From Swiss-Prot:
InterPro entries: Cyt-d_ubiquinol_oxidase_su_1 (IPR002585). Belongs to the cytochrome ubiquinol oxidase subunit 1 family. Keywords: Cell membrane, Electron transport, Heme, Iron, Membrane, Metal-binding, Oxidoreductase, Translocase, Transmembrane, Transmembrane helix, Transport. One of its GO terms (molecular function) is heme binding. Heme b b558 binds at H183, M334. This is Cytochrome bd ubiquinol oxidase subunit 1. Its main location: membrane. Its cofactor is heme b; heme d cis-diol. It catalyses: 2 a ubiquinol + O2(in) + 4 H(+)(in) = 2 a ubiquinone + 2 H2O(in) + 4 H(+)(out). GO terms for biological process: aerobic electron transport chain. Pfam families: Cyt_bd_oxida_I. Residues 448-468 are annotated as: Disordered.
Amino acid sequence: MSELVLARIQFASTTLFHFLFVPMSIGLVFMVALMETLYLVKKNELYLKMAKFWGHLFLINFAVGVVTGILQEFQFGLNWSDYSRFVGDVFGAPLAIEALLAFFMESIFIGLWIFGWDRLPKKIHALCIWLVSFGTIMSSFWILTANSFMQEPVGFTIKNGRAEMNDFGALITNPQLWVEFPHVIFGALATGAFFIAGVSAFKLLKKKEVPFFKQSFKLAMIVGLCAGLGVGLSGHMQAEHLMESQPMKMAASEGLWEDSGDPAAWTAFATIDTKNEKSSNEIKVPYALSYLAYQKFSGSVKGMKTLQAEYEKIYGKGDYIPPVKTTFWSFRIMVGAGVVMILAALGGLWLNRRKKLENSKWYLRIMIALISFPFLANSAGWIMTEIGRQPWTVMGLMTTAQSVSPNVTAGSLLFSIIAFGVMYMILGALLVFLFIREIKKGAEHDNHHDVPVSTDPFSQEVYHGISS
């Protein structure tokens, strides 16, 4: 394999693995903050137990996510130095803000939250976990600011062969950012909600701590349903924007080789033939693509062949069509998983309202399996986003082939891929082990564990302990 292919494999694999933990942390910490707030408002100890139990799982996930994220930024300098040299002035600014501001905020307030139980006033303690939640969201904002520049470069000028920032305001008001950011955050909230719902379903099947996990499930499904609808709405907005910013990605995601005609039908299924540049065995939904692209039931969508000819006039000779099969199917996996999650959330709330939830074993088993669906949807969405932008690293400015480090060797890349793979497998196994251990212990263990023990040698409890 070439250095370019190996560098892409390494970046894709490490990024996808890291992004298993990022949305989970954002979603879980939001749920924990919500639970602690409900405890303050309703004075119900059940919500306090919920905040502590799910908070333990959040901390485990957060720690592993931090470790996997450290390796990401090193790759820009080691494997993608030409990219870093060209856009570092623009791309580096939001990443620096993320590290110095957002992650710093998370680190401070997560410590106060961990060690502040029974030490800080209850409202201040709850504020700490909300600030952690805000910090995780702001981390995403700044990272997505950098990514949005790759999708739709703004706020820069080319000087001495480099992109230099000349408008920071344009960077943070990038239209791509404001359709991408809510889509990612709603997806993260759905991830945390469905994880809580799936674990709660497992416990309800076992008939363990039923009131606790039934309430956890109900809250998770309310958030999960709202998040799922938010994902759908923001995704629709993103599709509309793609028509302006990256029409080739839109065409590839539809397997659309020729212009669609007016109105445009959405292709639910197709056999993609990249060699002959055609699609067959298509199952189409009339008018749907026009609505997806223009929010009306009319309008045509340009095909990849038309766009290829247009791009050649702008950028010169080259192949500007991304990997079509990957882009096409990753989009459908993302959408399909999202639809299933929305239906599952509606079903769970209906069963809970009818007081049939804990006895619906078939549904609870489905919810355990659906823990994986948000991760599947998140990964598929990012695969579509990044693969669909190819051959560009920065849309219209720099190709992926131009971005790789000139001095990196295939041997060093292969070694680091194997080393990172082994380390990530160990981290993943450790996370699963710790999750299973905490889940088996249950919420009652956390409750007993948190009972304060007096350190006064003259207290009654300690005195009797010494006497015996």
